[in-house]
Design a protein with these regions (language model features):
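Extracellular beta-strand/loop-rich repeat segments of large surface/secreted proteins
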Residues: 2-137
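Flexible, glycine-rich linker and terminal segments associated
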Residues: 180-181, 185-188, 192-196, 475-478, ...
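Outer membrane beta-barrel translocator domains of Type V secretion systems
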Residues: 212-409, 515-517, 522, 591, ...
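Outer-membrane beta-barrel strand-turn architecture
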Residues: 279, 319-324, 361-365, 405-409, ...
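Outer-envelope beta-barrel architecture signal
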Residues: 281-285, 324-330, 364-370, 408-416, ...
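Extracellular/periplasm-exposed beta-strand and loop segments of Gram-negative cell-envelope proteins
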Residues: 304, 339-349, 372, 377-395, ...
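Residues on the lipid-exposed face of transmembrane beta-strands in outer-membrane beta-barrel proteins
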Residues: 311-317, 355-361, 372-374, 397-405, ...
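Outer membrane beta-barrel transmembrane domains
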Residues: 437-561, 565
Length: 607
């Protein structure tokens, strides 16, 4: 055979044979199987070559036909290195093998470079007889020790069924050559004389074909990671608002809503209160793209190279005062999310969308935000068997609580926080490209994230910060079955997250922000996000501030003249106070912080 030649022997070969009176063969025919390239010529031996003198020489003998068979020759001689590919039935401890009545003088080795596994083993270690004493010293398996044999790069080093992965070694014993098989989570070492040492790898997922693990990996590194990213980024209102010093937040919340009413004391201007004026309320919109690049060494699973990416677009209602000193705002958001994973020859991709809402509460330096979101994902896995397609539904709820400790009038803020979240992921059952039925129990995951942020407010509006978080995942084991075989329950190990970010405000209506966080531990890599926020709507008519003058002080207080429609009238009981500027509101807030919201006439005169 030459020039990538292939020969298919679909029928038996039975030549002329002479025998003596005792039935022994005295003369027979010869079959010489020879190629010009061991890796690029193939002889498909799908039937018997009976009673022949056979030689193998510089080619590949392929006996794969999904059934095991014992080939028997009169004589066999390996003239030069020859590859051999065989069917293996682990359940019955049988494989394709070659026997002969006699063996010639071998000048090469029979390299077993590939195996087609027909069934799974029922034992921890399965041994199968392969070579007779006349051949056993010239057999080399496809996974030698490094540098021991010069095997072609295409030699198969691990062996697969649709569910399991196997390691195999060749054990050359006195009575013949044996192949030893064990699942991939065990390393076999022959100790001679039929003895063998079994060493566990420590990772139960090593026992399985990577193609069968793709559903568990997609649930953890795809959907679960996507929901956790959403929880990190959906608290945009509190992230932006609570980076601002307290006095500036007071000025924002009480913008155009001051009123004064005297108490009757000439030295006391009166009680400070807020008036609702819908025309002066503004909403805001924000957009936040994100991406992460990482590897995830899953507990009880493979090490996964993972990329997540997406964009959230949100809308915040105005901050409104409610009861007992609390303020609140609502946020609605939608998002696109995607992820891709790569591990052990498997490529997975997920794409989907989500929708959610957040309620954020503020009181002084305290904030509490709760978000609820739900979405769907369609995904595909590209494996050695083909492409799997599946659909996932996900939902979750998260709550983040934090408090600001301010120093130097808000120039420095230390903000400890706690994020708690619950994630639900359901992957619908499907049949993969190998014909295995994949059944998925819903994933229930709880995440606990204590963290702290150190924020600096500069004079020019820049707000750089440093953040540190510790992430624990609880009850997040994925539960998946393949043809009723329970697969390892995988989860993401705890990890630490730290990094830097910055915000910048422009003209009181715009804000830009960016962040880079490094992750170490159960996730290793970097998460990046950036975005832009802008206020929408326009200011209404400025609100006038009215003070009623009581009789006690009317004799010393000049009456104010008010012109309306070009007419002059005198209002003996009222006077008009101009709207306060933003700078005046901040200065006034400094005197009102944590007070009963009363002030003196002297304070107002200073303003």
């Amino acid at each position: 055979m030459k020039n990538n030649g292939k020969f298919y022997m679909a029928d038996n070969i039975d030549g002329t044979v002479r025998k003596d009176s005792d039935g022994n063969i005295t003369d027979t025919y010869s079959v010489n199987i020879k190629g010009d390239d061991i890796n690029n010529t193939s002889f498909y031996m799908l039937n018997d070559i009976r009673n022949a003198n056979v030689t193998f020489d510089n080619t590949t003998i392929n006996a794969v036909n999904n059934q095991t068979h014992v080939y028997n020759f009169n004589t066999l001689t390996v003239n030069s290195d020859t590859n051999f590919v065989a069917d293996v039935d682990l359940a019955n401890a049988q494989m394709d093998r070659i026997t002969a009545t006699n063996y010639g003088t071998h000048q090469g080795n029979l390299n077993v470079v590939g195996m087609n596994l027909l069934s799974d083993s029922t034992k921890d270690v399965t041994e199968i007889y392969f070579a007779q004493p006349g051949l056993k010293n010239n057999v080399v398996n496809g996974m030698p020790k490094t540098g021991e044999y010069n095997l072609p790069s295409t030699a198969q080093t691990t062996f697969y069924t649709p569910i399991y992965k196997y390691n195999a070694i060749y054990d050359n014993r006195d009575d013949g050559g044996y192949f030893m098989f064990a699942k991939g989570d065990k390393i076999l070492t022959p100790s001679g004389g039929g003895g063998i040492t079994v060493t566990p790898t420590g990772n139960p997922s090593d026992a399985y074909n990577p193609a069968i693990l793709s559903s568990s990996v997609a649930s953890q590194a795809g959907a679960n990671a996507t929901m956790n990213q959403t929880f990190n980024y959906s608290f945009q209102n509190s992230d932006n608002f609570m980076s601002i010093p307290y006095l500036e937040r007071v000025a924002i919340k009480t913008s155009n809503r001051y009123a004064l009413s005297p108490t009757g004391d000439a030295t006391d201007v009166g009680t400070f209160s807020q008036l609702f004026n819908a025309q002066n309320e503004t909403s805001s919109t924000w957009v936040k793209p994100y991406a992460s690049f990482e590897n995830i060494p899953l507990k009880n699973g493979p090490k996964v190279s993972n990329i997540t990416y997406g964009t959230l677009v949100g809308f915040d209602t105005p901050i409104k005062s409610i009861r007992h000193g609390w303020d609140r705002t609502w946020t609605g958001y939608i998002g696109y999310n995607g992820a891709s994973q790569r591990y052990s020859g498997v490529d997975s991709t997920q794409n989907g969308g989500l929708v959610g809402g957040t309620l954020t509460l503020y009181k002084g330096n305290l904030f509490n935000a709760t978000t609820v979101s739900t979405g769907a994902i369609v995904g595909d896995n590209r494996t050695m068997y083909g492409t799997d397609n599946y659909t996932m539904l996900m939902a979750g709820v998260g709550n983040k609580t934090g408090y600001n400790f301010e120093f130097k009038e808000g120039k420095i803020i230390i903000q400890p926080s706690m994020l708690l979240s619950y994630t639900f992921v359901n992957t619908f059952d499907y049949t993969n490209a190998a014909g295995v039925r994949i059944k998925n129990d819903p994933l229930h995951a709880i995440q606990i994230v204590p963290g702290v942020k150190f924020i600096v407010n500069t004079k020019n509006g820049w707000q750089p910060y440093i953040g540190v978080n510790m992430i624990w995942n609880l009850l997040d084991e994925s539960k998946v079955s393949a043809n009723d075989v329970r697969l390892p329950e995988m989860s993401i190990k705890p990890y630490v997250q730290y990094g830097v970010g910055v915000q910048k405000r422009f003209k009181d209506r715009y804000m830009a922000f960016g962040q880079a966080m490094i992750q170490n531990g159960g996730r290793n890599g970097i998460s990046l996000t950036a975005g832009f926020r802008w206020a929408i709507g326009k200011d209404g008519k400025p609100l006038e501030k009215v003070q009623r003058v009581n009789n006690k002080v009317s004799s010393v207080t000049p009456r104010a003249e008010v012109k309306v429609a070009n007419n002059s009238t005198v209002q003996p009981e009222r006077k008009i106070i101009k709207q306060l500027t933003p700078e005046q509101r901040v200065r006034l807030g400094a005197r009102l912080q944590d007070s009963t919201r009363t002030t003196s006439l002297g304070s107002l005169r200073q303003i």
